[in-house]
Each structure stands twice: as C-alpha cells, then as structure tokens.
UniProtKB/Swiss-Prot annotation:
Gene name as annotated: ileS
Locus of motif 'HIGH' region: 59-69
Binding, Zn(2+): 861, 864, 877, 880
Binding site for ATP: 594
GO terms, molecular function: aminoacyl-tRNA deacylase activity; ATP binding; isoleucine-tRNA ligase activity; tRNA binding; zinc ion binding
Protein name: Isoleucine--tRNA ligase
Length: 885
C-alpha cells in the first residue's frame, strides 16, 4: 500500500552510485590527479616538514609484472600515502635494475645465438640496453594502473651513466680500503649461466643426487693399516672423483679396520653399524681401532686417475653426521678442500669447463656434461671392484636463481669483497635498526655473520665493468688517479666506453704505451642495486632512509648488498627500518607456475575488478608470511569493499541537508558512545599504520562498519526519515555521520585511493582540499572507554532480547521486531532511564518479573510504520502528527 505521507519524510538522496565502475573511475581520477599535479602539490605542501623516504628496491627490467610486484609496490604505496597524509615530505622515487644475465639471455635467444661469446660485446650491450629501456617503459605503464602515488617521471635506472659512476665510486672506496682482492678459489659456478654466482644468487631446491660409497686402495701403509687395505669414501658428486688428490680425517676421531670377505676396510668407528647396515654386511669383523692422526701420511691409489697416488691429511670439516668419517678431497671443488689443499700442497685439478663439460683432464670421460658422466664413473668404479654401494639421495641443493639449474662449487679466478675486516662495523651499524616482522634484523645479522667474502665478478657482457688495469707484470693496479679517471669517463659516456676503447685509450696519458691490459669481467648485479643509496639522490633527504620494504628473500639479496656498500661508503646502514613480505601463492597454498595453470596476473584483476580491489587484497593480507590469492579470496575482498562503499552511500545520502557550518551539535546518550567508538577506531588504526599492520587497519575498520550497520545505522533511520529536519536528535546523528565519514575517508585513502577520492569529491566538509590526498591525517594520543563501559549493560540486554525475538519470529508469534511486546526483567537503573522502545527498535517495552516476547496489539502509524498504543484520527503517531503540522 502506497504511503500517502511519503512526501513528508526526509528521504535520503543517493548521491554516491551503488555500482563502483572502478575501471572507468580509476582512469577518470588518475587523469584528475595528473592534470592537477596532486602528487607534486602534496610534496610542496610538506616540503618544509620532516622527510620520510621509503626507498624503492629496484625490480628487474624484464617481462610483465607478476602478482609479487603488485604486492610489493602497493604495500610501499600504502606507506607513502599514509606518511604524506601525516604531514611528511614523502617523495617516492621508483627504480629499475637493468643489468644482468636474464636480459643478456633474452637477447641471445631472440638473435638465436647459443653462446654470448659468438656476438660482439658492444652489439650485445647495445641490444640489452634497448631491451631494458623498453621493459622499463612497459612495467612503468603497468605500475601506473595500480594507482601509485608517484608521477613516475623522477625515477632511477642502474644503466644511467651517473648511477654507474656512483657505483664505481663505491668500488674505488672498497679497493683503496683494501677490501677488494682477486683470488683463485672455489665459488658457486653456474654452468647454465657460465658465470660465477654470489650466495645471494643461489636458491635451494629439492634435487636427486647420486650417493655412492667407494673404496680407495692403500698403496703405502704404516703400523695401523697395510697396503691393499681400503679407505671407505662417501660422495654425492662422483664427477669430482676425477679431481681427487687427497682424503681427510679428523685427528681425534676413532677409526676401525673392518674385515669383510677377506678384505680390510677403514672407516670411522662410530659409523661402523650404520655403514655396514647400508652395505648389508652381516659377517664382518672389527680387527683394530686407532685415531685419525694415525692415518696421516698414508697414500692410496686415486680412484679414477689410478696411475697417481694421494695422501691422507687432517681436515677440520670432517664430521660423523653422515658418510664414513673420511672425506674425499678435490681442492678446486670445495672451499674446505681448497683451504686444506693449499696448506697440504695437494694437486689442484680443473677438469670442468665453464659450460659444465669435462675437459681433457677427465680422460675417458672428456666432453661429457659433468652430471651425465656420473653413471659412467659409477660403472668404472664397479668394473674396478671399487663401488661398495650406490643409491640416490633427495636433498636440498643449490640452484641458479635465474635459470633454476643446479650449480657447482668450482675453482676460478674471481674478484671478491672481503667481509671479515668490516663485519664488526656492519653488525654495529644495524644495532638500532628496527624490523617488521621482528625476526628480520636477526636474520640479516646471521647472514652477515656467515659471510667471509662476496664474489663480485661475473664472466658476462651486460653489466658494469670491474675498473681494474693490469700492469706489464699482469698485476692489478689500485691507484686513486686511475679510478677517478675512469669514473669521470663513465659519468660522461656510460660504461660502454670500457668496451669501446682499448686499454691505452682508456688510460691517463702517463700510463699509456706500457703494455697494460684491462679487466674483462663485469660486476655482480647485486653490487649495482646495492649502490642505490649512493646512486639515488633525493633533495633534503640524506641517508639513512626511513624504510626498505621488500620480499623476505632480500635479506640475502638487496638488504645485504645495500648494507655492505653503505657501511663501506657512509660508515652506517642505509635504512632505519626493514619491512619484509612473503611470496604470493595460489588459493590452495601452492607455488604459482604456468604449467599448473594457477598463475594470477595483477593486470587481469585490475581489468576485471579494478585496482582498488587489488589494493584491498594487499592491505588485507598477512603479508609478513606467504600470502594467497585466487577467485574466492578476491571475492571476499569484493564483499568487504561493497560494505565500505554502501556505508559511505548511506552516510552521505543522509547528510544532504546537513550544514557542517551550523549543524554540528554537542552529543549525548547513545550518540556519545558512537563518538567514543570512532575515537577508538582512529587511535587503533593510526597505531596499525605506524606499525605497518595494514590487515589491522582493514579489520578494525570493517568491524567498526559492521557494528555501526548492525545497530546505529538501523536505529538512526526512523529519526533521520521521520523527525523534523532541525530536530536535535537528528542533528546529533548527522554530526556523527559527518565525523564518521571524515574519519573513514582518511583511514581508507591510502588503501582505496580512487573510491575515497570519488566519495571525497561529493562530501562537503570543513577546510576541504582539492583532493583527499592533500588532506591531513588525524592525530590522537589517547582514548577513553567511559561510554563503552556505561552502555555495556544495554548491549547485553539487546542481545538477550533479539535472541527471544528470533525465537518468536520462528514460532510465527510475530513477523518482525517492530511487532514485539518485550517484557524485561531488569534492575539496572541506567537501563530504566533509556528510551528502550526506540533503542531496541521494538513495539513496546515493559519491565516485569521475567523476560518474554508477546505480539504487540498496537496501532500502526501510517507515516513512520511503527506501532503505538494510540494514534490520531489520521492514523498518525504523536511525533508524526506534530512533524507534518
């Protein structure tokens, strides 16, 4: 039945559309921000204030952005937007990492060239530069769709000559401080990349390795062991047996001679039971036992190069955790082997080429890939009655982080940064650095503690050259004048000049024509990105910068290299706080891969739902651990978004006739409770923002909105729609709505920039700015809970009453709460002072001896649709009758 009094009601006006149309709105407001230079105005507004710098760790300029990029950049953007609103001068300077193997490999693949040595270095570098720049352009375009608070006009790229020159200054400082050295020693070597790798470029994956026990025949014994006895050796790298030149034992360990089938075998006493069980030996006999030191000097026949013998030596790295207690030594294929080998003068055999193939030193195994030679080596040992046991071992094994192929330890001449001399200084520099999560700083410290050196040379073309000249004696020259000369050239012409010019053309005049040569290797890309605190200049914001925020893998990567370089150059850490996030997995917690078909792309989410939904997912993710994404998770965030949007719609629709200049009122009663709850929300969300806990921001806001909707908004409807426009209760509600809207706009602006800008442009408030992103975030130092405590008894009563009403509706006693006659057994004096009929939104309330619900036989007011004991001849309640007079 049509309400004939409808025209007399204060019907809310739908100012904010129900449908968000985010894709269209995001383009509209992006244009608005750009045309009106909102980002620049925010910087100008805060220019004289304290700076806040979140330094952008550079993503790699290769390929489209993945969901991990979105997680990272949006987290950063939320921080920057919040700090800007809080009055800080917060420029965000994005950057790109542009050198390195993936780009080089991409060019080689496009040109259909198998080996980088089959193309001129200059041509490869030219193509790589062009490709990197095209990728920056592509990624920049994709980043901009995420509604980031930066114009992306001021950005850095590690291939810029000025940046490269700053990088060389860091190298120069290290060199002159005595931290740079060249040495032959085993390093991580990637056959798939044909280059050395630093620890930060190695990832550990499950790997299937050969596991063999082999016998080395003794040819020169002593009083403890005899000629033709056998040493038992365990290895998971049969291919390194070609380079065997020693066996190590632990001085104080006990070793036993075991007789089995008329042969004697030597291995650690503590491992006798374990090893014999592996071999399946039943009837063996322990003949004698002795210490490791008693075996030193014994010689054995090498397992592959059987024409040669090798000695037993002492080794600090021998353990009883696995194997046999005797360790096969190949000095160029293990760091401990190398160190001991140098002391004991063991032969150093390099039988592996750069690409992993076996060279002429491998005898009959030459020209085979090292891994492919394993079965043949095992067969050779078997034919020579030296293979005691063969199986496969599944274990965590180092892989090249770019190619995902296994790496090996391989001796080669490389350039290193010595970490040991500066380790104490590095550790001291992070004593006062904070981290979120809190374990971050201890993880970084542990990684620094475990480093002795940093391999910085790479045998590739696309990168910053190591600026070293060799004199006529082939000795590296470390002279400041030479470094400064090259730095000056690079700042003007870029690093291509190192490859374009001959050695004499590069040298200052007094060094020419002396038969000098130049280094061919380039620097590790982690050295590039680790130089950003020197290469990136932000006016008025010196190092250390406030926050570095990256994935948790960067504790061994960018956090690590940045810290080392900064301590060398600035004598301090480059950051005050470290924030790290996990990886993005699919909805079931699985790693994403194209083969599984579970890859979620940020551009797909943005084009379907809008960037604000993607940003809400980021803010609503517990990012300190791995996070998940998928259709269900996105839909959950869509529902939260709708709740926020619909709340704004309701609030603003009921503020159309509200004038903040004259209608703001002092609050009483239930309205004072809502004000107190709003102040609590402000206090807690500010703490959450300060602590990078964005999930708490969403959780707190969502809970506030939910509680608001479940009571106060419903309670307010009758007063808003049916009371006089100037009614005091109505103005109190609108005062709350006004303040709630203002607060929610600020809380959600860093997370939902488009939606909040849309609402802000509609909303009329005091001291309104051109954009919500030029507003000032609220400050609040304390909260009160006086009203919360006071009103607790009411909400306890409300819950009891509505539980009874639910039963009454189910039993068809009443159709709605509006028809409920509520009997309340209550002695609380505060409750007796309240207008419980209106607060509970029921037909009538009577205090009695028991709690119960009956059907209220009242009269329905045709205007407000509420039941009363009495209505007038026009079917109006007292209130409505007065309003329409």
């Amino acid at each position: 039945m049509k309400n004939k009094y409808k025209e007399t009601l204060n019907i809310p006006q739908d100012v904010l559309p129900m449908r968000a149309n985010l894709i269209e709105k995001e383009l509209k407001f992006k244009t608005f921000w750009d045309q009106n230079k909102i980002y620049q105005k925010a910087l100008e507004k805060n220019k004289t204030n304290k700076p806040f710098i979140l330094h952008d760790g550079p993503p790699y300029a290769n390929g489209d952005l993945h969901i991990g990029h979105a997680l990272n950049k949006i987290l950063k953007d939320i921080v920057v937007r919040y700090k800007s609103l809080s009055g800080f001068y917060a420029p965000f300077v994005p950057g790109w990492d542009t050198h390195g193997l993936p780009i080089e490999n991409k060019i080689l693949k496009e040109l259909k060239i198998d080996d980088h040595k089959n193309i001129s270095t200059l041509e490869l570098r030219k193509q790589a530069r062009e490709y990197a720049l095209s990728q920056i352009k592509n990624q920049k375009k994709q980043f901009l769709t995420m509604q980031l608070f930066s114009d992306f006009k001021d950005y850095y790229q590690t291939l810029d000559p000025k940046f490269e020159a700053e990088q060389l200054k860091v190298f120069k400082k290290m060199a002159l401080d005595g931290l740079i050295y060249k040495s032959l020693q085993p390093v991580f070597w990637s056959p798939s990349s044909q280059s050395a790798l630093a620890e930060a470029e190695v990832e550990y994956h499950e790997h299937k390795s050969h596991s063999i026990y082999t016998a080395f025949k003794i040819v020169k014994g002593n009083k403890f062991v005899e000629k033709n006895d056998f040493l038992v050796i365990w290895t998971t790298t049969p291919w390194t047996l070609i380079a065997n030149s020693g066996v190590s034992v632990k001085e104080e360990f006990s070793y036993s001679k075991i007789n089995y089938e008329n042969k004697n075998y030597i291995f650690a006493t503590d491992l006798v039971q374990k090893v014999t069980e592996i071999f399946g030996w039943k009837n063996f006999k322990i003949i004698s036992s002795f210490q490791g030191k008693d075996l030193v000097g014994i010689e054995y026949q090498r397992p592959i190069k059987q024409e040669k013998t090798a000695p037993i030596v002492l080794g600090h790295h021998v353990t009883l955790e696995s194997g046999s207690g005797l360790v096969h030594m190949a000095p160029l294929f293990g760091l401990d082997d190398f160190i001991i080998g140098r002391v004991e003068k063991l032969e150093e055999i390099m039988h592996i080429n750069d690409d992993g193939s076996i060279n002429e030193f491998g005898n009959q195994f030459a020209n085979k890939f090292y891994w492919d030679a394993n079965p043949e080596i095992n067969e050779f040992l078997k034919q020579n009655n030296l293979l005691l046991h063969h199986s496969f071992l599944y274990h965590s094994y180092p892989h090249d982080w770019r190619t995902n192929k296994p790496v090996i330890y391989r001796g080669s001449n490389q350039w290193f940064v010595s970490i040991d001399p500066i380790k104490e200084k590095i550790t001291k520099s992070i004593e006062h650095v904070e981290s979120y999560p809190t374990w971050g700083i201890s993880r970084l410290k542990t990684m620094i503690d475990n480093r002795t050196s940093w391999t910085i040379s790479r045998q590739r073309a696309w990168g910053v050259p190591i600026p070293i000249f060799y004199n006529e004696k082939n000795e590296p020259v470390f002279e400041e004048e030479l470094f400064d000369h090259i730095i000056d050239l690079v700042s003007k012409y870029g690093t291509d000049i190192w490859f374009e010019k001959s050695t004499d053309e590069l040298l200052p005049e007094k060094y020419k024509n002396k038969n000098w040569t130049k280094e061919k290797d380039i620097m590790d890309v982690w050295f590039d990105s680790g130089t950003t605190s020197m290469g990136v200049k932000i006016e008025g914001a010196p190092v250390p910068w406030d926050v570095y925020l990256e994935g948790s893998d960067q504790y061994r990567g960018w956090f690590n290299s940045s810290l080392i370089n900064s301590v060398v150059y600035y004598n301090q850490a480059p950051f005050k706080k470290l924030v790290s996030h996990g990886f993005v997995l699919d909805e079931k917690g699985n790693k994403m891969s194209k083969s599984k078909g579970n890859v979620v792309l940020p551009q797909e989410i943005i084009s379907k739902f809008g960037a604000d939904i993607l940003r809400l997912w980021v803010a609503n993710s517990e990012y300190t651990s791995d996070v998940t994404i998928g259709e269900n998770i996105i839909n959950q965030n869509v529902e939260i978004y709708r709740k926020f949007r619909n709340t704004f719609r309701f609030l603003i629709a009921n503020l159309v006739d509200f004038d903040y200049k004259k209608d703001l009122k002092e609050l009483t009663g239930i309205h004072l409770l809502i004000k107190e709850q709003l102040e609590t929300l402000k206090f807690n969300t500010k703490i959450a923002y300060e602590n990078f806990q964005f999930t708490n921001v969403i959780k707190l806001t969502n809970n506030f909105v939910y509680n608001l909707s479940s009571f106060y908004l419903d309670f307010s409807k009758d007063i808003l729609y049916a009371n006089k426009i100037e009614d005091l209760q109505r103005k109190m509600i609108q005062t709350n709505f006004y303040n709630i809207t203002k607060t929610l706009l600020l809380i959600l602006a860093p997370i939902l920039p488009t939606t909040i800008e849309e609402v802000y442009q509609i909303f009329d408030q005091a001291n309104k700015k051109e954009s919500v992103h030029l507003e000032n975030f609220f400050g609040i130092s304390s909260i009160e809970t006086i009203q919360e405590e006071k009103w607790n008894s009411f909400f306890e009563l409300k819950n009891k009453v509505y539980a009874l009403i639910e039963i009454a509706i189910k039993d068809k006693l009443i159709k709605s709460a509006n028809q409920a006659l509520v009997y309340i057994k209550e002695t609380d004096e505060f409750l007796k002072t309240l207008d419980l009929k209106n607060l509970l939104m029921v037909g009538k309330v009577i205090f009695s001896k028991e709690n119960k619900i009956e059907n209220y036989e009242g009269h329905l007011c045709e205007r407000c649709r509420i039941y009363f004991d009495f209505i007038d001849k026009d079917n109006l309640c007292v209130r409505c009758s007065k309003v329409i007079l």
